[in-house]
Curated annotation (Swiss-Prot):
InterPro entries hit by this protein: DiS_bond_form_DsbB/BdbC, Disulphide_bond_form_DsbB, DsbB, DsbB-like_sf
Side Cytoplasmic, residues: 1-8, 61-67, 161-162
Membrane association type: Multi-pass membrane protein
Source organism superkingdom: Bacteria
S-S bridge residues: 35-38, 101-128
Protein name: Disulfide bond formation protein B
Keywords, alphabetical: Cell inner membrane, Cell membrane, Chaperone, Disulfide bond, Electron transport, Membrane, Oxidoreductase, Redox-active center, Transmembrane, Transmembrane helix, Transport
Pfam families for this protein: DsbB (PF02600)
Amino acid sequence: MTPLFRKAVWLLFAVSVCAFAGSLAAQYVLGMEPCVLCISQRLCVLATALCTAIVLMCRPRRRAGGLFGAVFISIPAVTGISVAAYQLWLQSLPPGTAPSCGAPWTFRLKGWPLFDWFEPVVRGFGNCAEPDYLLGIALPVWSVAYFLAVVLTVWWAWARAK
């Protein structure tokens, strides 16, 4: 792994941890009630952080290893982009016409062995079609920006690594 690629992955790890902490702070400090899609995006942020940590621990030595790392980090980020884009579409629909965004994560994972430990991360029953704003910008737009920055950064760093 070249120094540039390694620094980029460290940066993505730090930004991902901050984004995850920010999503928890928005819920538990600011009192925002996350919806199912918000929690899905939160899980994609967490998965991105975990993928960057794994790539940092594996320390790929060849360009092909860096390629694997870039793909590995990009998968949860691209998934997050698609979830956030779907939520933006839901929020663009006229009031009352948006479909349900699914069963709450707490319902889906109730029988899971680690549910008691993981429950604060997936708790939330907000309405997916009702936008919440941060600095005047809808939260799914922030999510798309974050995930897009992850994808662009990791592929830029991989392309520059020689």
